[in-house]
Amino acid sequence: MDLSEPIHDFLLVFLGSGLILGGLGVVLLPNPIYSAFSLGLVLVCTSLFYILSNAYFVAAAQLLIYVGAINVLIIFAVMFMNGSEYYKDFHLWTVGDGITSMVCISLFISLITTISDTSWYGIIWTTRSNQIIEQDFLSNSQQIGIHLSTDFFLPFELISIILLVALIGAIAVARQ
């Protein structure tokens, strides 16, 4: 997207704060319906990040698959549960939550240091081969596959991890 630098920076900060607030809402809100809507906010902000990065196809796939299908499925599953049990005995902080948050924070810090210290361009899967690929001989689905396995490999994998964590969290909330 061709935006001026101050507008682009403002949108990055705005979408980043939306991601942080939505993620906190998924984890901290006691009502699973509100958590599912917060997950929808996180997924929409992620697709808007892709639009800012000029990855329109990945943004459309994010909206259609994750927000349009999976998040709606989670909301339907939560709606069939008994909702009155989530308002009884709600304690914001317990000892187990503190231990879990310390483990999560330490994992997050180790992931951030690993990601920042890694040279992603030296990995063979994130670089294109030296062969010249004729665009005329490839179908659209082959071009999408090449882009997902080269240009958008890291964002695609990060999105899959975020979705996996969200689904595990939804299952954990549904079992309680």
From Swiss-Prot:
The membrane topology term of the UniProt record is: Multi-pass membrane protein
Per UniProt, subcellular location reads as: Plastid, Chloroplast thylakoid membrane
For this protein, the record's Gene3D superfamilies field holds: NADH-ubiquinone/plastoquinone oxidoreductase chain 6, subunit NuoJ
Q: Which InterPro entries does this one have?
A: NAD(P)H-Q_Oxidoreduct_6 (IPR050290), NADH_UbQ/plastoQ_OxRdtase_su6 (IPR001457), Nuo/plastoQ_OxRdtase_6_NuoJ (IPR042106)
Instruction: State the GO CC annotations.
Output: chloroplast thylakoid membrane
Pfam families per the UniProt record, alphabetical: Oxidored_q3 (PF00499)
What keywords does the record list, in alphabetical order? Answer: Chloroplast, Membrane, NAD, NADP, Plastid, Plastoquinone, Quinone, Thylakoid, Translocase, Transmembrane, Transmembrane helix, Transport
What sections of the protein cross the membrane? 10-30, 32-52, 61-81, 92-112, 152-172
Which reaction does this enzyme catalyse, per its entry?
a plastoquinone + NADH + (n+1) H(+)(in) = a plastoquinol + NAD(+) + n H(+)(out); a plastoquinone + NADPH + (n+1) H(+)(in) = a plastoquinol + NADP(+) + n H(+)(out)
> Does the keyword Transmembrane helix belong to this entry?
yes
Per the UniProt entry, the Enzyme Commission number(s) are 7.1.1.-
Q: Tell me a Gene Ontology molecular-function term this record carries.
A: NADH dehydrogenase (ubiquinone) activity
The family line of this record is:
Belongs to the complex I subunit 6 family.
The record describes the protein's role as: NDH shuttles electrons from NAD(P)H:plastoquinone, via FMN and iron-sulfur (Fe-S) centers, to quinones in the photosynthetic chain and possibly in a chloroplast respiratory chain. The immediate electron acceptor for the enzyme in this species is believed to be plastoquinone. Couples the redox reaction to proton translocation, and thus conserves the redox energy in a proton gradient.
Record note on quaternary structure: NDH is composed of at least 16 different subunits, 5 of which are encoded in the nucleus.
Q: What is this protein called?
A: NAD(P)H-quinone oxidoreductase subunit 6, chloroplastic
**Which organism does this record belong to?**
Solanum lycopersicum
